[in-house]
């Protein structure tokens, strides 16, 4: 739909799409056109002729309520405590760490330092699809890469393990004592889609509104922020700029210190 608008008129885009959505579509179209030029299907990229400054974009809505609340988080985690399976445990652990879902999926047992109560984040699990010669895409394949989101060194970091986080890992070890990765449902690495499908299922069963795995990071950052620890949070979140971290803040609390930031996550002891 956006592609049709780009080759149409300014009126077609006006106030219908956010700047981010149009920018994402532009990137995809540029990639397709570049491929077509390489294959000598076309000689010129028509997307480069579009003046994107002419468009009036749809304002981004304030989404302060589009995250987990503390009450809903406690309700969900209390419900999940009795469900001992990989997805439940992965969801629970996500509420106790400043972690991306791709990083959660890629945690190996060797990354856990029980003596110092730390987990080291060295990699992420992603899904990739290959563009075929007929311009169709192959089926998705899970791939673990030693490269973090944003392709910067800021993604490589360590996280403190609270008592609750350690309990979750012990349960995961009982389920999967010989696996390479901590969470391996049916002996395979979980996908983000399957993670979110299970999260949605459990939210419904627990009677709380569903939000995606990414919104867990919004909740954790907001819960741990005290007005003074933005730099610390930015490191823990794996961000290269504090401006990115500010985007995640919804509600704030008054606490300071690296490890104390973790004490507010999940269900506080």
Name these PLM-found stretches:
Residues 70, 160-208:
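Active-site/catalytic core of tyrosine-dependent DNA strand-transfer enzymes
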Residues 59, 125, 230, 237-262:
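Catalytic-site neighborhood detector that most strongly recognizes the C-terminal catalytic loop/helix
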Residues 20, 38, 92, 96, ...:
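C-terminal catalytic core of tyrosine-transesterase DNA break-rejoin enzymes
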Residues 3, 21, 25-29, 86-87, ...:
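Hydrophobic (often cysteine-bearing) scaffold residues that line and stabilize catalytic clefts
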Residues 19, 23, 27, 38, ...:
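Basic, Lys/Arg- and aromatic-enriched nucleic-acid-binding interface segment
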């Amino acid at each position: 739909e956006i592609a049709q608008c780009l080759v149409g008129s300014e009126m077609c885009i006006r106030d219908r799409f956010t700047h981010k959505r149009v920018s994402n579509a532009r990137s995809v179209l540029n990639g397709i056109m570049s491929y077509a030029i390489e294959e000598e299907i076309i000689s010129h990229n028509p997307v480069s002729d579009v003046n994107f400054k002419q468009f009036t974009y749809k304002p981004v809505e304030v989404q302060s309520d589009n995250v987990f609340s503390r009450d809903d988080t406690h309700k969900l985690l209390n419900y999940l405590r009795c469900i001992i399976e990989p997805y439940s445990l992965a969801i629970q652990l996500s509420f106790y760490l400043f972690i991306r879902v791709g990083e959660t999926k890629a945690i190996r047992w060797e990354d856990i330092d029980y003596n110092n109560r730390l987990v080291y984040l060295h990699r992420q699990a992603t899904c990739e699809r290959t563009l075929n010669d007929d311009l169709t895409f192959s089926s998705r394949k899970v791939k673990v890469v030693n490269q973090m989101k944003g392709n910067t060194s800021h993604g490589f970091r360590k996280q403190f393990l609270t008592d609750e986080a350690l309990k979750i890992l012990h349960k995961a070890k009982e389920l999967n004592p010989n696996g390479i990765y901590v969470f391996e449902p049916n002996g395979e690495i979980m996908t983000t889609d399957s993670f979110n499908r299970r999260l949605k299922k459990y939210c419904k069963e627990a009677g709380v509104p569903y939000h995606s795995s990414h919104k867990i990071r919004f909740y954790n950052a907001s819960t741990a922020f005290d007005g003074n620890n933005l730099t610390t949070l930015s490191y823990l979140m794996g961000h290269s700029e504090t401006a990115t971290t500010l985007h995640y803040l919804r509600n704030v609390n008054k606490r300071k210190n690296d490890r104390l930031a973790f004490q507010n996550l999940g269900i506080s002891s």
